[in-house]
Design a protein with these regions (language model features):
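Short glycine- and basic-residue-enriched patches
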Residues: 1-63
Length: 63
């Protein structure tokens, strides 16, 4: 299983939070929240216990 990552992330509402995730894959496309094609990190959000798609350009800093 991949190692957990921790990073600061700015969501579509411009709110910044620290996220701890287990990566699943990197993919290119768009989502409901990001209407332009871009790179995403699909990961298991360990705090919410849900799979999420994180826009790579909105990852501010790895911790």
């Amino acid at each position: 299983m991949p190692k957990a990552l921790k990073f600061e992330y700015k969501n579509w509402e411009n709110k910044i939070a620290v996220r701890t995730v287990k990566p699943i894959k990197i993919w290119y496309g768009k989502t409901e929240w990001h209407s332009e094609n871009q790179w995403f990190l699909k990961a298991l959000d360990l705090d919410k216990n849900e799979e999420r798609d994180f826009s790579i350009r909105d990852i501010l800093e790895f911790l």
